[in-house]
Amino acid sequence: MESVLGRGSMGTVWAATDEVLHRPVAIKQVNVPPGLSAGEVARLRERTMREARAVAALCSPYVVTVFDVLTPDAGPVIVMELFRGRSLADVIRDVGRLTDGQAATVGVAVASALRAAHAAGITHRDVKPANVLIGVDGGIKLTDFGVARSSAEPTITGTGMILGSAAYLAPEVATGTPVGPLSDAWSLGGLLFACVEGRPPFDRGTPIATVASVVKDPVPAHPHAGRLGRVISGLLLKTPSLRMRLDRALPIMRTVADDPSGTHLTTSPENPSSRPDHPDRLHA
């Protein structure tokens, strides 16, 4: 291992070199929080192994590749692709709003990654701008498939645990309905909303207030959505059975992204995603 890329409440990431294949990699060690019972530790290891193996089986250019996973006593270790760029959250923070063409380019990548995951029986559960990487070459990757999430970023999972980001939480998840692909579709709608409006659709300052708003409040207007307006509106329908599905949203987004007026989205090499902008944001 060569250098520490970032430390967070759930683990540490290093840059390293695979000495067999001579390629750069990122290595994440998932911490075992103190105070857990033996059963809780076993479940943490089992969940990490199961999800890391599932992500490793995905064949998508839009997913950060997992090469290997190990289980030493100190905590699970995940060997993964080293992808240089910035998070979409940081791009939005710096530029304010993306064009509809740029947002559609992101949407195509994220939706494609989600379709590959859903086909493999995986639901992401935490789609948000902080979990999307924009590469220095314009490549886009979806990260954090539940391998290691920080409890400092609240979301409600199907088990009732609070993990992730409430601002992009599907309303049915907040009310206890099991998580599924349509929940990821809602979160993609929230992500696209943030791209074109510069803020999430629901954010009331605290996780509890935000979750209540997701469940009860109407979806805010999105006047800057442009040609993505019907996609965002369709993905953010609160009734899952009425919500736009990814296979319907993708062709629309491709048309918008392929339009010459859509600016190619890149990030500067001075801000590599391998060095997290936030200590708790560990890309994997």
Whereabouts are the PLM-identified features?
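Eukaryotic protein kinase
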Residues: 1-269
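C-terminal or otherwise distal, non-catalytic regulatory regions appended to signaling enzyme catalytic cores
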Residues: 273-284
